[in-house]
């Protein structure tokens, strides 16, 4: 047994050794010995258990060894026994030594733990400290997360510090040290709290004992010091002694701050010194009341008595708000009569007369002895005394009359603190009535309440004739001793106020002298009140003058004078007093030190000045290439993605060497790469070392990447001050220099903005090779250490023509290629050239350029079109035209090597390009910067953007360009100088004197737009709007609208003469003399219609494209002429047109005829002064010989098939695109007989067949029904005179604020200073107040999403549920016989968390911001975040949606469905239990409101504005709009009375043609008419789109006339509304369809050319099974030439919707193979689809036909024939009879089903 014992002993010894190296822990016994009042640091459980096991093993082994020793003593062998005992004794000694060491270690650990040292620990989160609280152990304190951010700066703010400290303790779950029953806390917790509050106090207020261990010592010390400093006179702790407030206080913010500090102080006093008082509320109320003057105290008590306490706010806050509101409401004194501060105690809360420090009058003192004299300015007429003297005099008079007894019955008391009027004399009351209720007032006249017996009205005399008397509501109180009039009510009703010293009561008309008796203001009753039987007049009392007096010399300090004079300049004040400009004799006392006004320094702080030459002095201290400044220019406005938008510039401060580079973006990687490249270039090529770089604080220069690079290179990066752009002025100026140089190069070369990067490179190179005026050296030579030689002739002119060698030329082919010079290639010895024929930019040094000094005719593309003086014959002209044409054809497909752009071949067909070629042969003159040449080789996105300054303009302050002008004054003058028509060509009457015009020199060519390109480029909106009545001349000069000049039309062209208007004879053949003769024939003066009713005085346009303007009894046709002066064509830029479009969208449609290319400009002056109204000019399509209109489609259907009408305004694009092409020019004459060449005759013949652009008003976005008006905080609360409404809004506001706190949208306790947060991360908020129709007051705090920075959001688009998805949901739920409920999710957006970092202003402290945690209303990403949050939640519980029906979710077993649109939900389940379980699950995560539930198997509710009735037992669903139609009936009741009732909503015929008929009305009438039409059609579109398919055709038909406010159009609309009101029960009816083989059936119809513009209309009705799904009537998207083509178009549209419905149903599990059945009544269409071959048709129709044929072959659809009479879709394309319309109503009611329709076909 000895061997095991020894082995075990060795193990014990080893265990003992390992136990010695364990961590410092304590046993459970040691912990139990610790006093309960002082907790220790806890030990990990596993270490305790291991340590306990080791101790137990030691004890067990020791006991075993001792037992073994006893057994050995009994052995016989003494020698063996001695040896064993010796060894065993040694082992026992070692074990005991180990145990002793362990015990010592335990004692040492216990001693250390008893010290309660606060140890620092570190984990993954950061540094923390462990301590125990009374409720928890091992609590961790992380200093970086638990921040106490309040810092006090004076002793008065200590209560606020303590209040915030209490919130801090509560928030982070420390022990509440403010509880009196706490004796001891953990010393480590005490140490943490001591550190925190010491940091809050700061060094200047450190009153804390650093060795203290009791937190109560800190609190008691703070209270004691605060009481001693702030409440010196409060020995008995009387509340409110240091503050006095009366009705003259106007600084509400300061008063609120003072009262809040008072409340906090009284709380601490109450907790320590007022424990006998059981109610804290009563104590605080008494404290606040103690601060109020007697004139204010009773009114506050009355308000507290009458207004209930808002439970949503604290009691002390309610008291403070009541005091402030009472002070604001009860002050009748005008602002100019209020003292800035009390003259005795300098307080701003009360006036001098109520001050407690006011001297005792009985002692004969007028002011305190210590008070310095206050001198007021006195006028020389001595009519006004100083306030002190006036007060003394008034007091003396009062003392002389002290023995006089006043009769209270003849006097009226003016109460400045009361809000009601009372009297004890019933005879003063008019219309007296006894009070039926027991009404009592508190605080009026007596200390107790008084009862009101009745009420009436007292008339106040308010003038000499007493005709304007005002009545005041007055209560009859017999208990009162006299009549009391409220000063507030008197001022409100009669504008009568008290004077400054209460000596006068009156207004501008009447003044009444007052009497002050025992501190109460009295006036004579007969001077103020008119008795019911007294009609005598009261004369106004004139004030008497005061005797004169002499002013003594006064002394005034500079500080006092500075404050009195409104903090103006000290030098001005000293000079004014020194030069005796004031009546007083003043001695100015100056302080020994320099005068310092902190208010002025803060309010008038300015940026430091940058003196001229300061940067030059800095640059001389650095060697060349060592100091650089850099900046970024951009973005350049361009719609092309392949155009670089930014330019980086670096300028050497010493040599002015400049380095530029252009980039697509300005992110950190791009800029860093370029800066690195530039620095390496300078160091390698110029052998210079870059040591410092100056830049602004843009994010591209202040990121970590570029800073790391600068540090690695040892470069000093100098940043400018915030918003101090002048500090980087050198880079700013060089940006302007380079950009203006590049703009000049682009302008002179007539190149597009895409070439701006090459122009910048060229400009930079040139500047580096020119001597700088400051240094006198070439920058390149100055910066380079090596000698540099420069040759001037090595520079090539930018944008000029040149010839380069073609190294790939073939034999017998020219070896030269025409090109355009760009700039030097920095990577080679050659130049960059643009080769139009190759569409490439290449580098070459094999070039040849012309000598421009010898021949000025061969210039760049701007001057390719030679003037007539250089052309000798037709051959030269044709050669020039051919050259320009070839160049244009090459430029139109330009493509850089590295930047592919859109090619015209990809945009247009060969036919369109051929028309472009024909137009390209007649380029613009050289002085037209927006000519056809640019249009030909420009892509669609940049068409018309030729104003280089406008495109290069940015928000950078260094570049300022005039966007409204194309040419500068200098350029404009040069343009005028180059004009070849003399001003003398226009006579005084504004007519063109053709005898002075040299027709050979005036050569302009006509430009037209290809008709096919018109449709493709214009899209669907061809509107050009002109506004600004004050600038008619500018407006008429526009190239887009013709050229009616000035503000009137005194002479107009009479186009009724056959010699001018004959269609068969070209106008170009007319002689100028004939034109002049026709102009002189017109003697009519044009006047425009005056204001009148909408839709009246309408004249129609005749077939000769004339405008008939009604002037009295005559109709005057008007023909507009084009300008011949280039000044008129160039002075009006497209930017102005865009500006005009934004200002007004509804100009009246007056047509401008531009079909004659030989017209000239005409200026006319209106003789009778009639101003020309704003014109809407449209071009009329040229009719053919047979009168048919062959112009292409130039407008798009304004109808919206699935939503209310919306507008896509493309008029700005049209203005830019065709601004230059609308210019008309004269043809060149070559012979004396004015005959045309054969070429021109052939050209004119072709032109006469071309169509022109039709400009009509675009469609404005419709307006929905008027919403409830929302108001803001000032109107709802701050300035709301209705106290009840204000109270309701306050409750709503606090409820909303509390709701945001409960939802944890933000944490008001964690706030940040605005200076710490970047401005782009702060989003301002607004509070919207509304009163709903049910009377509930609502407040909603929303973000200003319109001011959001792009840094605060990324993707904001989201998909949501639409109305068709709701209908699918209802049909499926009904077919599955499911239980349904509807509900709302309250404040839905607030459940979604924000991914971005956004801050909003703090709700209580606008100086701070709080971090936004949830998606608050108004943020751009809130809808997306909410949809994603809801989708994630529903997907997590097993409900999925799909791409076809976003917002519609269902489970895999299809037993639960939910459709969600924002916060409106409808839920369907297979059983009621599952439905309730799902709703309860939603309630656990969202706050819900059940809006509809099944009652007796019937669900009657509303969903998405529709009235829903679901009968589960019968299996029916009805959708109607009764509620909305009833509101329409009430709204338009008066208009509907004039409409005859009808059983159909549409008209029998539609004959209105807005393209031919012209409205004659004023602009304002037109605008108001269109606005009214948009509102009406918006409501009708809403009704139609929801569920009223019976008005589909009628609404879509009249919707095309939304911009035509004719009385017949209004009649059509009101007829539809009358029909809706009469048949409001019609809607959609669904029956339960249990058929498993449900089909998708569509019936279509079409009518060709039935619209006023020869467009076609199609109609489609769609069923799913036996229930109708969708109905729509649309105008065809393409022009159909036959009925068969229109029918094919309708079949395709019906099939497309059917296929979409089929796929959607498949995703929802409603059958995998739903057959599609198409029904039509067109036999030719069916035969055409069944043919094996197809005849050539229009491109788009052919594609659609082939798709249908392919589906028929695949048997995906079945095409059936129905008779024309049986086609129910016929009413969607044309007006039908009442019987046919009733048949369609039966379809909507599901009395005629799809199966009945199939029975009528060949199915």
Curated annotation (Swiss-Prot):
What Gene Ontology biological process does one annotation of this record name? proteolysis
Task: Give the UniProt subcellular location, in the record's own words.
Answer: Cytoplasm; Nucleus
Q: Where does Mg(2+) 2 bind?
A: 1384, 1463-1464
> Active site: which residues?
415
Alphabetical keyword list = Aspartyl protease, ATP-binding, Coiled coil, Cytoplasm, DNA integration, DNA recombination, DNA-binding, DNA-directed DNA polymerase, Endonuclease, Hydrolase, Magnesium, Metal-binding, Multifunctional enzyme, Nuclease, Nucleotide-binding, Nucleotidyltransferase, Nucleus, Protease, RNA-binding, RNA-directed DNA polymerase, Transferase, Transposable element, Transposition, Viral release from host cell, Virion maturation, Zinc, Zinc-finger
Its recorded reaction(s) are: DNA(n) + a 2'-deoxyribonucleoside 5'-triphosphate = DNA(n+1) + diphosphate; Endonucleolytic cleavage to 5'-phosphomonoester
GO cellular component labels: mitochondrion; nucleus
Pfam families named among the record's database cross-references? Pol_BBD, rve, RVT_2
Extract the coiled-coil ranges from the record. Answer: 39-115
Chain spans, region Disordered: 1224-1250
Post-translational modification comment from the UniProt entry: Proteolytically processed into capsid protein (CA), Ty4 protease (PR), integrase (IN) and reverse transcriptase/ribonuclease H (RT) proteins. Initially, virus-like particles (VLPs) are composed of the structural unprocessed proteins Gag and Gag-Pol, and also contain the host initiator methionine tRNA (tRNA(i)-Met) which serves as a primer for minus-strand DNA synthesis, and a dimer of genomic Ty RNA. Processing of the polyproteins occurs within the particle and proceeds by an ordered pathway, called maturation.
EC id? 3.4.23.-, 2.7.7.49, 2.7.7.7, 3.1.26.4
Q: Which residues bind Mg(2+) 1?
A: 631, 696
For binding Mg(2+) 3, which residues are annotated in this chain's numbering? 1645, 1687, 1721
Show where the Integrase catalytic domain sits: 620-787
GO molecular function list:
aspartic-type endopeptidase activity; ATP binding; DNA binding; DNA-directed DNA polymerase activity; RNA binding; RNA-directed DNA polymerase activity; RNA-DNA hybrid ribonuclease activity; zinc ion binding
Give the protein's biological function: Capsid protein (CA) is the structural component of the virus-like particle (VLP), forming the shell that encapsulates the retrotransposons dimeric RNA genome. The aspartyl protease (PR) mediates the proteolytic cleavages of the Gag and Gag-Pol polyproteins after assembly of the VLP.
Q: How does it assemble?
A: The protease is a homodimer, whose active site consists of two apposed aspartic acid residues.
- Could you tell me which PANTHER family the record lists for this protein? TRANSPOSASE, PUTATIVE-RELATED, TRANSPOSON TY4-P GAG-POL POLYPROTEIN
Q: What is this protein called?
A: Transposon Ty4-J Gag-Pol polyprotein
Identify the species of origin. Answer: Saccharomyces cerevisiae (strain ATCC 204508 / S288c) (Baker's yeast)
Task: State the organism's lineage.
Answer: Eukaryota, Fungi, Dikarya, Ascomycota, Saccharomycotina
**Gene of origin?**
TY4B-J
């Amino acid at each position: 047994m000895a061997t095991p014992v020894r082995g075990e002993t060795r193990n014990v010894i080893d265990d003992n050794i390992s136990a010695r190296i364990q961590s410092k822990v304590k046993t459970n016994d040691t912990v139990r010995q610790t006093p309960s009042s002082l907790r220790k640091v806890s030990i990990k459980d596993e270490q305790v258990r291991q340590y306990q096991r080791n101790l137990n093993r030691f004890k067990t082994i020791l006991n075993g060894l001792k037992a073994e020793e006893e057994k050995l003593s009994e052995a016989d062998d003494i020698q063996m026994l001695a040896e064993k005992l010796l060894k065993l004794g040694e082992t026992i000694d070692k074990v005991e030594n180990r145990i002793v060491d362990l015990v010592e270690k335990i004692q040492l650990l216990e001693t250390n733990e008893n010290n309660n040292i606060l140890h620092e620990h570190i984990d993954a989160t950061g540094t923390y400290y462990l301590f125990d609280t009374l409720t928890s152990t091992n609590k961790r304190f992380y200093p970086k997360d638990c921040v106490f951010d309040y810092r006090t700066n004076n002793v008065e703010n200590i209560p606020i510090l303590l209040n915030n400290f209490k919130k801090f303790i509560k928030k982070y779950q420390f022990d509440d040290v403010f509880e009196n029953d706490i004796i001891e806390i953990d010393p480590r917790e005490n140490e943490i709290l001591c550190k925190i509050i010491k940091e809050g106090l700061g060094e200047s207020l450190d009153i804390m004992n650093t060795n203290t261990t009791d937190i109560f010592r800190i609190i008691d010390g703070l209270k004691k010091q605060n009481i001693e400093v702030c409440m010196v006179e409060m020995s008995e702790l009387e509340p409110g002694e240091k503050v006095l407030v009366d009705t003259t206080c106007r600084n509400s913010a300061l008063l609120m701050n003072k009262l809040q500090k008072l409340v906090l102080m009284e709380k601490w006093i109450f907790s320590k010194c007022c424990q006998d008082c059981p109610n804290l509320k009563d104590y605080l109320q008494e404290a606040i009341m103690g601060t109020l003057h007697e004139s204010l105290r009773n009114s506050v008590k009355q308000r507290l008595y009458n207004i209930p306490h808002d439970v949503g706010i604290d009691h002390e806050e309610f008291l403070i708000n009541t005091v402030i509101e009472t002070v604001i409401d009860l002050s009748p004194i005008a602002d100019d009569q209020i003292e800035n501060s009390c003259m005795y105690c300098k307080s701003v809360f009360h006036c001098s007369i109520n001050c407690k420090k006011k001297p005792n009058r009985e002692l004969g003192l007028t002011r305190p002895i210590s008070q310095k004299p206050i001198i007021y300015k006195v006028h020389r007429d001595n009519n006004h005394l100083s306030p002190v003297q006036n007060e003394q005099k008034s007091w003396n008079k009062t003392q002389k009359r002290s023995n006089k007894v006043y009769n209270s019955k003849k006097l009226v008391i003016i109460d400045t603190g009361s809000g009601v009027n009372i009297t004890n004399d019933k005879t003063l009351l008019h219309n007296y009535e006894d009070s039926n209720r027991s009404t009592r007032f508190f605080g009026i006249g007596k200390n107790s309440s008084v009862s009101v017996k009745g009420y009436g009205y007292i008339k106040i005399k308010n003038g000499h004739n007493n005709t304007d008397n005002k009545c005041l509501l007055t209560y009859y109180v017999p208990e009162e001793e006299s009549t009391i009039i409220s000063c507030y009510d008197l001022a409100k009703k009669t504008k009568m106020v008290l004077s400054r010293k209460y000596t006068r009561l009156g207004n501008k008309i009447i003044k009444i002298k007052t009497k002050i008796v025992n501190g109460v203001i009295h006036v004579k009753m007969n001077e103020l009140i008119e008795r019911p039987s007294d009609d005598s007049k009261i004369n106004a009392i004139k004030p008497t003058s005061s005797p004169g007096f002499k002013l003594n010399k006064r002394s005034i300090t500079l500080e006092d004078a500075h404050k009195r004079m409104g903090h103006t300049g000290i030098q001005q004040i000293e000079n004014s007093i020194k030069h005796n400009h004031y009546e007083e004799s003043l001695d100015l006392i100056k302080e020994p030190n320099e005068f310092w006004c902190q208010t002025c320094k803060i309010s008038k702080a300015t940026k430091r000045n940058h003196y001229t030459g300061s940067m030059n002095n800095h640059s001389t201290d650095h060697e060349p290439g060592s100091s650089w400044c850099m900046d970024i220019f951009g973005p350049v406005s361009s719609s092309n993605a392949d155009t670089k938008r930014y330019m980086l510039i670096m300028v050497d401060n010493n040599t002015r060497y400049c380095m530029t580079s252009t980039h697509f973006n300005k992110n950190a990687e791009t800029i860093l790469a370029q800066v690195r490249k530039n620095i390496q270039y300078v160091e390698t090529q110029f052998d210079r070392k870059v040591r410092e770089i100056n830049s602004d604080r843009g994010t591209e220069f202040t990121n970590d990447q570029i800073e790391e690079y600068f540090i690695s290179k040892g470069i000093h990066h100098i940043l400018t001050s915030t918003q101090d752009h002048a500090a980087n002025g050198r880079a700013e100026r060089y940006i302007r220099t380079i950009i203006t140089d590049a703009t000049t190069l682009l302008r002179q070369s007539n190149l597009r903005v895409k070439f701006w990067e090459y122009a910048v490179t060229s400009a930079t190179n040139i500047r580096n090779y020119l001597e700088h005026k400051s240094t006198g050296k070439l920058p390149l030579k100055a910066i380079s250490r090596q000698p540099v030689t420069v040759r001037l002739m090595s520079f090539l002119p930018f944008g000029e023509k040149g010839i380069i060698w073609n190294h790939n030329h073939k034999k017998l082919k020219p070896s030269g290629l025409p090109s355009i010079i760009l700039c030097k290639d920095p990577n080679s010895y050659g130049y960059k050239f643009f080769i139009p024929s190759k569409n490439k930019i290449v580098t070459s040094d094999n070039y040849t350029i012309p000598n421009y000094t010898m021949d000025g005719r061969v210039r760049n593309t701007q001057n390719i079109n030679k003037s007539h003086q250089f052309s000798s014959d037709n051959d030269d002209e044709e050669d020039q035209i051919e050259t320009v044409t070839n160049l244009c054809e090459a430029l139109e497909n330009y493509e850089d090597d590295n930047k592919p752009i859109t090619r015209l071949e990809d945009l247009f067909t060969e036919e369109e390009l051929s028309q472009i070629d024909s137009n390209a042969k007649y380029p613009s003159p050289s002085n037209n910067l927006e000519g056809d040449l640019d249009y030909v080789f420009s892509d669609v996105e940049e068409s018309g953007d030729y104003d280089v300054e406008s495109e290069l303009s940015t928000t950078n302050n260094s570049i300022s360009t005039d966007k409204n002008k194309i040419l500068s004054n200098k350029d404009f003058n040069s343009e005028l100088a180059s004009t070849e028509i003399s001003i003398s060509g226009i006579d005084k009457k504004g007519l063109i004197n053709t005898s002075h015009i040299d027709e050979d020199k005036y050569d302009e060519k006509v430009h037209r737009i290809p008709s096919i390109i018109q449709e493709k480029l214009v899209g669907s909106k061809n509107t050009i709007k002109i506004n600004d009545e004050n600038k008619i001349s500018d407006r008429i000069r526009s190239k887009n609208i013709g050229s009616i000049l000035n503000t009137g039309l005194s002479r107009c062209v009479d186009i009724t003469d056959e010699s001018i208007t004959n269609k068969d004879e070209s106008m170009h053949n007319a002689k100028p003399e004939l034109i002049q003769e026709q102009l002189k024939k017109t003697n009519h003066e044009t006047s425009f219609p005056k204001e009148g009713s909408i839709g009246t005085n309408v004249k129609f346009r005749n077939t000769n494209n004339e405008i008939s303007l009604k002037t009295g009894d005559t109709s005057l046709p008007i023909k507009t002429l084009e300008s011949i002066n280039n000044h008129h064509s160039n002075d009006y830029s497209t930017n102005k047109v865009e500006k005009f479009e934004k200002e007004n969208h509804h100009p009246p449609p007056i047509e401008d005829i531009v079909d004659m290319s030989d017209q000239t400009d005409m200026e006319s002056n209106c003789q009778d002064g009639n101003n020309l109204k704003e014109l809407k000019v449209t071009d009329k399509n040229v009719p053919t010989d047979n009168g048919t209109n062959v112009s292409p489609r130039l407008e798009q259907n304004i109808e919206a098939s699935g939503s209310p009408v919306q507008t896509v305004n493309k008029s700005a694009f049209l203005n830019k695109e065709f601004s230059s092409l609308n210019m008309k020019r004269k043809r060149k004459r070559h012979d004396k007989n004015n005959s045309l060449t054969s070429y021109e005759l052939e050209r004119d013949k072709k032109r006469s067949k071309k169509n022109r652009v039709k400009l009509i008003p675009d469609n404005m976005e419709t307006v929905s029904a008027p919403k409830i008006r929302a108001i803001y905080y000032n109107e709802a609360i701050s300035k709301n005179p209705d106290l009840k409404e204000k109270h309701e809004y306050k409750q709503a506001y606090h409820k909303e604020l509390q709701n945001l706190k409960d939802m944890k949208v933000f944490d008001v306790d964690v706030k940040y200073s605005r200076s710490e947060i970047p401005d782009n991360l702060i989003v301002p908020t607004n509070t919207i107040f509304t009163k709903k129709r049910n009377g509930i007051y609502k407040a909603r705090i929303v973000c200003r999403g319109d001011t959001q920075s792009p840094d605060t959001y990324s993707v904001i688009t989201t998909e949501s549920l639409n109305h068709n998805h709701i209908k699918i949901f209802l049909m499926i739920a009904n077919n599955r016989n499911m239980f349904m409920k509807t509900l709302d999710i309250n404040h839905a957006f607030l459940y979604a968390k924000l991914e971005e970092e956004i801050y909003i202003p703090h709700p209580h402290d606008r100086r701070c911001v709080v971090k936004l945690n949830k998606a608050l209303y108004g943020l751009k990403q809130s809808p997306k975040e909410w949809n994603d949050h809801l989708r994630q939640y529903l997907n997590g519980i097993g409900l999925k949606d799909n791409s076809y029906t976003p917002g519609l979710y269902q489970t895999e077993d299809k037993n639960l469905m939910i459709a969600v649109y924002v916060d409106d939900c409808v839920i369907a389940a297979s059983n009621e239990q599952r439905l309730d379980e799902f709703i309860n699950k939603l309630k656990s995560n969202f706050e819900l409101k059940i809006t509809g539930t099944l009652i007796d198997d019937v669900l009657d509710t509303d969903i998405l504005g529709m009235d829903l009735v679901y009968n589960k037992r019968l299996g029916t669903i009805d959708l109607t709009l009764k509620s909305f139609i009833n509101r329409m009936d009430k709204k338009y009741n008066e208009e509907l009375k004039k409409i005859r009732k009808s059983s159909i909503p549409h008209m029998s015929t539609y004959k209105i043609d807005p393209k031919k008929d012209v409205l004659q009305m004023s602009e304002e009438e037109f605008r108001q008419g269109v606005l009214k039409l948009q509102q009406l059609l918006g409501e009708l579109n809403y009704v139609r789109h929801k569920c009223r398919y019976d008005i589909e055709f009628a609404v879509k038909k009249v919707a095309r006339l939304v911009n035509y406010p004719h009385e017949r159009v209004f009649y059509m609309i009101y007829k539809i509304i009358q029909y809706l009101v009469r048949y409001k029960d019609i809607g959609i009816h669904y029956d339960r369809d249990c058929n498993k083989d449900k089909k998708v059936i569509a019936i279509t119809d079409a009518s060709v050319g039935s619209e006023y513009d020869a467009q076609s209309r199609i109609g489609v009705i769609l069923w799913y099974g036996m229930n109708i799904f969708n109905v729509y009537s649309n105008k065809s998207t393409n022009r159909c030439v036959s009925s068969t083509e229109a029918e094919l178009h309708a079949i395709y549209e019906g099939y497309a919707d059917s296929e979409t419905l089929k796929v959607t149903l498949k995703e929802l599990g409603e059958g995998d193979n739903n057959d599609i059945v198409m029904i039509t009544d067109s036999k030719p269409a069916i035969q055409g689809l069944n043919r094996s071959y197809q005849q050539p048709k229009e491109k788009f129709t052919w594609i659609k036909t082939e798709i249908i044929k392919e589906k028929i072959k695949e048997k995906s659809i079945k095409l059936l024939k129905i008779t024309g009479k049986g086609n129910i879709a016929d009413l969607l394309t044309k007006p039908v009879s009442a019987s046919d319309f009733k048949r369609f109503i039966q379809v909507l009611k599901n009395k005629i089903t799809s199966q009945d329709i199939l029975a009528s076909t060949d199915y």
